[in-house]
Amino acid sequence: MHADFWQQRWRAGQIGFHQAQVNQDLQQYWPRLGLAPEARVLVPLCGKSQDMSWLIGQGCHVVGAELSETAVESYFSEHGVQPQITRQGDFSVYAAPGIEIWCGDFFALTSQDIGHCTAFYDRAALIALPADLRERYVQQLEALMPRECNGLLITLDYDQSRLEGPPFSVPPTWLQAFVSGNWNITKVGEHDALHSSPKALKAGVERLDEQVYVLARKLR
């Protein structure tokens, strides 16, 4: 998926991946991370997710990363917030109480840019990327996050041969192969998401599972 693909999707309003409501898995499983008050939380490929406002409401400081300026501006306008906008290198940084969104290439971010984030939340980043970029994404996430951190990861698992992504299928075997080396992976939830996806039903997909994981970085 090239940057132009996602830019065009946002400009055209083709954002079926966007959830208008706060994700239920986030609300149910986020407390398992046991974060300190005012923890900085990285939300990669954040779009204009309502989940960010929920995290702010939990006392977190959200650090979003998003390629599309349209998505970032929509987030703040829909919440009636006027952000302070500054330029930091190749990024435009939109900041308001409890949140900052770095608008630009996620893969160009550094840990110095985003500060000390002790947790991350990924509902729609990993599954948005094809296999080759997923490996690069995991490496970038590890470069951005500190030695002691954890996160909540939500994935989809389905027969990829029946449906062309995004969203892509990220089965447990992929996580075991490419994530488990540096992270302890605990599955905390799973449910059938097939009937909430008209695209999958139309394609004849017979099984679509949403899976929820808590990831904790292994101490070396």
UniProtKB/Swiss-Prot annotation:
Residue ranges the record marks as coiled coil: none
GO MF terms, alphabetically ordered: thiopurine S-methyltransferase activity
Enzyme Commission (EC) number: 2.1.1.67
InterPro entries with a match to the protein in the record: SAM-dependent_MTases_sf, Thiopur_S-MeTfrase_Se/Te_detox, Thiopurine_S-MeTrfase, TPMT
Family per record: Belongs to the class I-like SAM-binding methyltransferase superfamily. TPMT family.
Organism: Pseudomonas syringae pv. tomato (strain ATCC BAA-871 / DC3000)
NCBIfam families xref list: PRK13255.1 (NF009732), TMPT_Se_Te (TIGR03840)
Enzyme class (EC, first level): transferase
Entry binding sites for S-adenosyl-L-methionine: W10, L45, E66, R123
Catalysis: reaction(s): S-adenosyl-L-methionine + a thiopurine = S-adenosyl-L-homocysteine + a thiopurine S-methylether
Compartment(s) of residence: Cytoplasm
Taxon lineage: Bacteria, Pseudomonadati, Pseudomonadota, Gammaproteobacteria, Pseudomonadales
GO cellular component: cytoplasm
Protein name: Thiopurine S-methyltransferase
A single GO BP: response to metal ion
Keyword terms, alphabetized: Cytoplasm, Methyltransferase, S-adenosyl-L-methionine, Transferase
